[in-house]
Amino acid sequence: MIDARDVTAVVVTYNRLPLLRRCLAALQAQTAQGLRVLVVDNASADGTAEYLKTLAMPGLVCRILTENLGGAGGFAYGMQAAAELGCKAVWLMDDDTLPEPQALEALLAADAAMDGAYGWLSSRALAPDGSDQPMNLQRKTMYRDIDGFDGKEIPAVMASFVSLFLRMDTVRQFGLPIAEFFIWSDDWEYTRRISRCKPCRVIPASRVVHAMQNPGIVNIARDVPERWARYRYFYRNDVVLYRREGGAGWLWLLAKDAWHTVQVLRDSRGRRAERIGIIWKGFAAGVKFRPQTPYLP
C-alpha cells in the first residue's frame, strides 16, 4: 500500500510564478500529508528560480534548468529525478493545476482499492467556474471523450498531465514521456502507451482546477495569433500518436487536419496560407518523425 510519504508530485513550470504559488499552496493543503514536491523550472525568466530558492516548504525539491525543455522534456526530466529520490509513485501536474484538498487522498484510496493493478489514475479537471475543463476530458477511446464522471472509477485510454498518478514500477516498465515532443500530445502518447497494456482509470473523487490562461480546444483556427507558430508541434506529434492505431488512426489524422484547414479558411483574421502551411508541414514532419521511447537508466 502506498501512502502520501511514498509519492512525489512533479510540477513543471515556465514563466507562471503567480500560478505556481497557487499550485504549491494547494499541494501543501492536501489532506494526505507527507507528500514530497519536485518542481522543475524550465528556465523561467520571471523570478521563479529566485522564489523557489527562498521558499521554506516541507518536502520541496527544486530543479532549476538552464534551458526550456518544454512540457514534455520537463516531465521526462522530473520523473527521472523523482525516481532518483526513491519514491514509489509520481503525481504529475502543470503549474496551473490547483488540486482540491482531497485530490491526493482520493487517488491513494483508488490505488489501494485496485491494489496497484492499473496503469495510471487521472483526476477530474474543472475550469475555475466549476464546469468540466474541455481540454482535459479523458478519452474512452482514441476518438471519443468519456461520457461523464458518474461512478467511483471510469475506464479511459488517454489523459492529460494536469493530474496523473502512476506507480514507479509502471514508469520503469513503460519508460518516460518523449522529450522531443516538446509540447502537445506528449501526455496522450504516454498515457496511450500504457493503456494498451494495462487498465487505466479516471477517479472522479479526485478533483483539480485547471486554471488555464488560454482555455478551449487546441485548434489553430480558433487560437490567438501569438500561439500559432507552436502548432507545428501539435500537428507533428499527433501523427506519432495516431499512426500507431493503424488505418483508423490515419483516417482520423487526415479528417482532423482537413477540418482544421476548412476552419482556417472560414476564419476572418487572415494569414490563412501561413496557418494552413503550419498544419500540413506539421503533418509532413510527423510522417518522418520517429522518436525513440526513453527509459529510466
Spans of model-derived segments:
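Short, acidic, metal-binding catalytic loop of nucleotide-sugar glycosyltransferases
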Residues: A25-G34
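A conserved acidic beta->alpha catalytic loop
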Residues: A26, D41-E50, T97-L98
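Conserved donor nucleotide-binding strand/loop of the catalytic core
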Residues: K53-G73, Y77, A81-E84
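Short beta-strand-to-loop acidic/aromatic patch adjacent to the donor-nucleotide binding site
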Residues: C87-D96
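Conserved donor NDP-sugar-binding/catalytic core segment of glycosyltransferases
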Residues: Q102-M135
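A recurrent flexible, glycine/aromatic-enriched loop bordering the glycosyltransferase active site
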Residues: D147-L166
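A short, conserved alpha-helix in the catalytic core of glycosyltransferases
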Residues: L164, T170-G175, E180-S206
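Non-catalytic, C-terminal membrane-associated alpha-helical segments of glycosyltransferases
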Residues: G247-P297
